[in-house]
């Protein structure tokens, strides 16, 4: 008997990818086959992104393609919070659900493509179905956000902060490690707020009490013996408490911490922490405790009302902070964001020019910091083996968004293998290396 077949398109951030993995895991458990082409699918699920206008358009185009190529389409994800927009553009869509609406998605699938039988879990590995390579995985610890940044609509799309029970998070992490995962990337909308909504209550893992708190979770994950990387960390004072764990080697010495700007006035308009001097002081403290710390951040240029002097404050901040990795976005209005009502929009050509200037400054800083690694030997994790050699990452590099290490001729290595590499050359993003003697 032929299994019902589902095509699946996953768009957006790693947190959305985790949602896709959960839906696909349940589909597999219920006997649905996941297929790679529209032609082979009986129905298509599209997990969308609705964070910025470009992502909205990409999602709408993906939905349109699925409708044109297959005809039976269910839409979920962040853009699903705006069903009228989806249905106006694509009225043939069968069902629209919001973000992390797993049960609604499954009910829609059941309605339009019933399963052949009741669920049977032997089709699914204990760690669930993942969409990442086998050697690394994203671990989502919470959903939603309690902040109200004026440029952001995440709380409207995904709600306020809802932390997962710490025992559930740790059990999932253990299963990932047992399945051979070498690196766990901790994600959420606000990782360092973990447990705040639960009053940091005590949970249980492995029969022992464990507080539902960012610091305790980081410490427990650090005991699992794999790379643990922290993403989407908000600059709360208690972040200081995890830096010693990085210095000890229990966590990767890496923080993904979006600062967004450096001008006090712009930060206030963004409804972000507005004390840049405190951020610089924190960076100095962190580096004193953990000199190997890698800092990644993101910034927005061209926010409404941003002046040339305020933009130069941001450039001065970059010069002083000496961050390792930086992402930069030109501000664009997002439907439903409070910032849309702010006066004095920055012209598009000015936004583009400031973006280019910022990235030029940061490329010089990143290149200088990477050049200090030449001649050093470090442990790297192999992501890919190609004809020319191996492509790997350092502890300082997250997959997809950071740099890579190219090891010429190392075609005998295995994906997911840890090796020692000596760095011989660098640019602003990547390193070239040989296997250590």
Curated annotation (Swiss-Prot):
Keywords per UniProt: 4Fe-4S, Cytoplasm, Iron, Iron-sulfur, Metal-binding, S-adenosyl-L-methionine, Transferase
UniProt key word Metal-binding: yes
EC number(s) stated in the UniProt entry for this protein: 2.8.4.4
Binding site for [4Fe-4S] cluster 1: 13, 49, 78
Cofactor: [4Fe-4S] cluster
Organism, as annotated: Methylococcus capsulatus (strain ATCC 33009 / NCIMB 11132 / Bath)
One Pfam family hit: TRAM_2
All copies of domain TRAM, residue ranges: 371-437
Name listed for the protein in its UniProt record: Ribosomal protein uS12 methylthiotransferase RimO
Tree of life domain: Bacteria
Disulfide bonds: none
CDD domains cross-referenced by the UniProt entry: Radical_SAM
Catalyzed reactions: L-aspartate(89)-[ribosomal protein uS12]-hydrogen + (sulfur carrier)-SH + AH2 + 2 S-adenosyl-L-methionine = 3-methylsulfanyl-L-aspartate(89)-[ribosomal protein uS12]-hydrogen + (sulfur carrier)-H + 5'-deoxyadenosine + L-methionine + A + S-adenosyl-L-homocysteine + 2 H(+)
SUPFAM superfamilies: Radical SAM enzymes
GO function terms (MF aspect): 4 iron, 4 sulfur cluster binding; aspartic acid methylthiotransferase activity; metal ion binding; protein methylthiotransferase activity
InterPro entries with a match to the protein in the record: Elp3/MiaA/NifB-like_rSAM, Methylthiotransferase, Methylthiotransferase_CS, Methylthiotransferase_N, Methylthiotransferase_N_sf, NA-bd_OB-fold, Ribosomal_uS12_MeSTrfase_RimO, rSAM
Domain Radical SAM core span(s) in chain numbering: 131-368
Residues at which [4Fe-4S] cluster 2 binds: 145, 149, 152
Subcellular localization(s) per the UniProt record: Cytoplasm
NCBIfam families: 30S ribosomal protein S12 methylthiotransferase RimO (TIGR01125), MiaB/RimO family radical SAM methylthiotransferase (TIGR00089)
Family: Belongs to the methylthiotransferase family. RimO subfamily.
All copies of domain MTTase N-terminal, residue ranges: 4-114
GO cellular component annotations of the record: cytosol
Cofactor note: Binds 2 [4Fe-4S] clusters. One cluster is coordinated with 3 cysteines and an exchangeable S-adenosyl-L-methionine.
């Amino acid at each position: 008997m032929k299994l019902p077949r589902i095509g699946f398109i996953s768009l957006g951030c790693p947190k959305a990818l985790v949602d896709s993995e959960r839906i696909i895991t349940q589909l597999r458990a219920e006997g649905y086959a996941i297929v790679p082409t529209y032609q082979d699918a009986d129905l298509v699920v599209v997990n969308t992104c609705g964070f910025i206008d470009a992502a909205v358009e990409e999602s709408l185009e993906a939905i349109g393609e699925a409708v044109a190529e297959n005809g039976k389409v269910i839409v979920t994800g962040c853009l699903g919070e705006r069903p009228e927009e989806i249905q106006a553009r694509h009225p043939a869509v069968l069902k629209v659900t919001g973000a992390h609406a797993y049960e609604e998605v499954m009910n829609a699938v059941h309605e339009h493509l019933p399963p052949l039988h009741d669920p049977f879990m032997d089709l699914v590995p204990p760690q669930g179905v993942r969409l990442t390579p086998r050697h690394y995985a994203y671990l989502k610890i919470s959903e939603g956000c309690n902040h109200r940044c004026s440029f952001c609509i995440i709380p409207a799309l995904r709600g306020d902060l809802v932390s997962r029970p710490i025992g559930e998070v740790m059990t999932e992490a253990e299963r990932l490690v047992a399945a051979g995962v070498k690196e766990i990337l901790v994600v959420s909308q606000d990782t360092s707020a973990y447990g705040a909504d639960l009053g940091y209550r005590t949970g249980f893992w492995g029969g022992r009490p464990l507080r539902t708190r960012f610091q305790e979770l980081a410490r427990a994950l650090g005991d699992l013996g794999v790379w643990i990387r922290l993403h989407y960390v908000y600059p709360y004072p208690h972040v200081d408490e995890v830096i010693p764990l990085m210095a000890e080697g229990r966590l990767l010495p890496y923080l993904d911490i979006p600062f967004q700007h450096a001008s006090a006035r712009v930060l206030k308009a963004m409804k972000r922490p507005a004390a840049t001097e405190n951020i610089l002081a924190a960076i100095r403290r962190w580096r004193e405790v953990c000199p190997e710390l890698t800092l990644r951040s993101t910034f927005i240029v061209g926010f409404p009302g941003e002046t040339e002097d305020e933009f130069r404050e941001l450039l001065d901040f970059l010069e002083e902070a000496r961050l390792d990795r930086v992402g930069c976005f030109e501000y664009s209005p997002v439907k439903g964001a409070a910032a849309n009502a702010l006066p004095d929009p920055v012209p598009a050509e000015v936004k583009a020019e400031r973006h280019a200037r910022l990235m030029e400054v940061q490329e010089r800083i990143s290149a200088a910091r990477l050049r200090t690694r030449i001649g050093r030997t470090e442990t790297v994790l192999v992501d890919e083996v190609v004809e020319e050699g191996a492509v790997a990452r350092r502890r300082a590099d997250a997959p997809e968004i950071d740099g890579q290490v190219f090891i010429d001729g190392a075609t005998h290595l295995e994906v997911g293998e840890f090796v020692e590499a000596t760095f011989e050359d660098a640019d602003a993003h990547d390193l070239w290396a040989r296997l250590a003697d």
